[in-house]
Amino acid sequence: KITGAINKAMLAVESGNTESAQNVALSVYKTLLERKKKDQEYVPTIEEVQDVVETQLMESEFKEAAKAYILYRNKRAQQRQTDLFEKRINLKPYEYPHLYEYVPAIRHSYWIHSEFNFTSDIQDFKSRLSDSERSAIKNTMLAISQIEVAVKSFWGDLYHRVPKPEIGSVGSTFAESEVRHADAYSHLLEILGLNNEFKKLKKKPAIMKRVRYLETALKNSRSDDNREYAESILLFSLFIEHVSLFSQFLIIMAFNKHKNMLKGISNVVEATSKEEQIHGDFGIDLIKILQKENPDWFTKEYHKNIQNMCKEAFEAEKDVVDWIFEKGELDFLPKAV
């Protein structure tokens, strides 16, 4: 095979003959044999063999054949280049096997809210918290639930736009976890008596400001344009899976850490935060792949647009934190933190 590939390169530039190709192939064999002598475990990859062929051709008198061989390799590499948006019908081989690792990651973190006991949490909320603390918890729970219950169908639709079986499996696994999150926070709203308060959220300016920037982040999630959809993956991963939730997670868990209260709810929040971190990391990995496959999409204008949205998100989330502490800050967790 090596001789044949070299011979084709020589024929393409009308330089050398079969014997010349055999001589170069022999030098390739000798080079690989020397490596084997130094390391008995050494088994060359196809890429390594091709690299040696390039080197031996460049060091021979057949420089034009070397150039032809290099150009052919580059052309073949481009033909093999992956495309995240190109449909693949066959299950295997996976084009993105490392992404499938997110499936067992979620499976290993599996939980349901019925595993936790909330009896003491109800007592804490109704009778042990001060008015300002109760207000902070109420608003925090409403803010989390607005995200977890209302706006999380993105991953379940992923395969329709990124039709790779391994990526579809991740999306479906994430979608199942989002259903568990929605069930958990729906249950917490119920036991804390906050269902009616949840209905009033649309009258809260801070929450509606957040809704507007999140809607902007999601506006391209139904787009048929690959570039626009790629932007929605980035914005969803950044803002909905990360930015919009973690300040509220910190507040809830601080009550358990500093006051030994709300243990059950804190357990739910901790379990949720671990899965949301996994979701966000997956989205970031998708963006890294898209950057590699479509570098021309990520222009200065694109980066500026993302930066502007980050600033808008920061201002909106500041307002949410102000609203959470509308009846006073917590002694053990100042608003500035």
Segments predicted by a language model, with ranges:
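Non-heme di-metal
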Residues: 82-337
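Long, C-terminal-biased catalytic regions of enzyme "large/alpha" subunits
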Residues: 1-82, 289, 296, 318
